[in-house]
């Protein structure tokens, strides 16, 4: 069986890892063993944080919507409830963008949510009054 010299393959692998470790501090950018450990860990963090980013942005959108809705005299939960009862299906990302950049349009959305909440409150209270008498 012929002897296999792995120098070229090993050098290419090491070069690839060291290329990924560019910008790291200290031994982690020079030594292959430290660089490999650091690159592996950085990939784990990147995988985890791609999932976390979605949660973080959703929380940010909710905070922005809540702040804008409270200025209009509603809470976030009541606003979302009113939108669903009014049949308006806009996701939180778009709602927060509208709240930040187009306040007039957002005020119209809040008004329609309030109207839907009041309409349902009036119809349910009338039904209960008839049952009590």
Swiss-Prot record:
Key words, A-Z: Ribonucleoprotein, Ribosomal protein, RNA-binding, rRNA-binding
Keyword Transcription regulation attached: no
Single GO MF descriptor: rRNA binding
PROSITE patterns the UniProt entry points to: RIBOSOMAL_L20
PANTHER family the UniProt entry points to: 39S RIBOSOMAL PROTEIN L20
Recorded family membership: Belongs to the bacterial ribosomal protein bL20 family.
Function: Binds directly to 23S ribosomal RNA and is necessary for the in vitro assembly process of the 50S ribosomal subunit. It is not involved in the protein synthesizing functions of that subunit.
Protein known as: Large ribosomal subunit protein bL20
Source organism (scientific name): Bartonella quintana (strain Toulouse)
């Amino acid at each position: 069986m012929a002897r296999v010299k792995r120098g070229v393959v090993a050098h290419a692998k090491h070069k690839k890892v060291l290329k990924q470790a560019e910008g790291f501090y200290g031994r982690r950018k020079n030594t292959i063993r430290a660089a490999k450990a650091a690159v592996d860990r950085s990939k784990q963090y990147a995988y985890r944080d791609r999932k976390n980013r979605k949660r973080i942005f959703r929380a940010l959108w909710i905070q922005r919507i809540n702040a804008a809705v409270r200025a209009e005299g509603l809470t976030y939960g009541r606003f979302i409830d009113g939108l669903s009862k009014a049949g308006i299906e806009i996701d939180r990302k778009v709602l927060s963008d509208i709240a930040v950049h187009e306040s007039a349009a957002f005020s119209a959305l809040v008004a329609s949510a309030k109207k839907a909440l009041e309409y349902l409150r009036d119809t349910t209270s009338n039904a209960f009054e008839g049952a009590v008498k």
